């Protein structure tokens, strides 16, 4: 069973909800208040566990406070929506740079998506990079290389060229992504809920509205429009 934790003001409320055919437990409220905030938090974590919750979308940067619940992070969701994220950033240039510590299946998927959008793709993917390059050549006829990057997509190493796009486990602390349902009358969905839907293979069609870099050295807002 999946869970969703949202810290807000007010008394905590735990309730079962449904979205896009997926049921989950939602816990919302102030979990840090009271005379013994640590005790309150542990009590509510215990209630989630008794409801069968083992994985949950948790407040960014607070994942360790909710052990033994395992976090559902947004990096997988963002990888799945990489083309829309690139549209929101709208980088001006024909070269992309992909950074990763190893050329795993996630790096391959990102490389394939980038190769379909940019004329040139540079790779710095550590171990197995040559195998990744051969696979891209065989599948897409792509030879890697190019000039300065208009955008850097990273799974870990710090970006140093062009507009950054983070697919790291802590991506929610580095960039804020705003989403919208196709029906504009519906309230914008929180990324935590979308991450749960993606994990459950229940993600409906959604729109990426904007990507805001939270790194204080690069406080820029890039809108899809």
State each model region's role.
Residues 1-6, 145-176:
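Short, well-ordered secondary-structure micro-motifs within conserved domains or adaptor modules
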Residues 1-7, 55-58, 94-103, 122-125, ...:
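Short hydrophobic beta-strand segments
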Residues 1-23:
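N-terminal basic/disordered segments at the start of proteins
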Residues 17-19, 28-30, 166-225:
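Adenosine-phosphate binding glycine-rich loop
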Residues 34-50, 79, 83, 107-111:
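Well-ordered, non-membrane alpha-helical segments in soluble/globular domains
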Residues 41-70:
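N-terminal glycine-rich phosphate/adenylate-binding segment common to multiple enzyme folds
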Residues 69-85:
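A glycine-rich, Thr/Ser-enriched phosphate-binding loop motif common to dinucleotide/cofactor-binding enzymes
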Residues 91-148:
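Glycine-rich phosphate/diphosphate-binding loop of Rossmann-like nucleotide-binding domains
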């Amino acid at each position: 069973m999946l869970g969703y934790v949202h810290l807000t003001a007010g008394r905590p409320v735990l309730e079962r909800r449904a979205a896009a055919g997926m049921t989950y437990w939602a816990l919302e409220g102030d979990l840090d208040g009271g005379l013994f905030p640590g005790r309150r938090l542990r009590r509510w974590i215990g209630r989630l566990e008794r409801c069968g919750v083992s994985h949950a979308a948790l407040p960014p940067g607070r994942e360790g406070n909710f052990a033994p619940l395992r976090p559902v992070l947004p990096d997988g969701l963002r990888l799945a929506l990489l083309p829309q994220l690139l549209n929101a950033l709208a980088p001006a240039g024909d070269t992309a740079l992909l950074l990763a510590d190893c050329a795993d299946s996630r790096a391959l998927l990102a490389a394939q998506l980038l190769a379909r959008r940019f004329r040139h793709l540079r790779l710095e993917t550590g171990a197995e990079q040559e195998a990744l390059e051969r696979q891209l050549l065989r599948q897409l006829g792509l030879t890697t290389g190019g000039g300065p990057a208009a955008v850097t997509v990273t799974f870990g190493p710090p970006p140093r060229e062009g507009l950054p796009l983070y697919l790291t486990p802590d991506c929610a602390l580095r960039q804020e992504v705003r989403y919208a349902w196709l029906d504009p009358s519906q309230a914008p969905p929180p990324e935590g809920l979308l991450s749960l839907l993606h994990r459950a293979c229940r993600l409906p069609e959604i729109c990426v509205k904007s990507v805001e870099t939270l790194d204080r050295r690069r406080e820029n807002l890039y809108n899809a429009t």
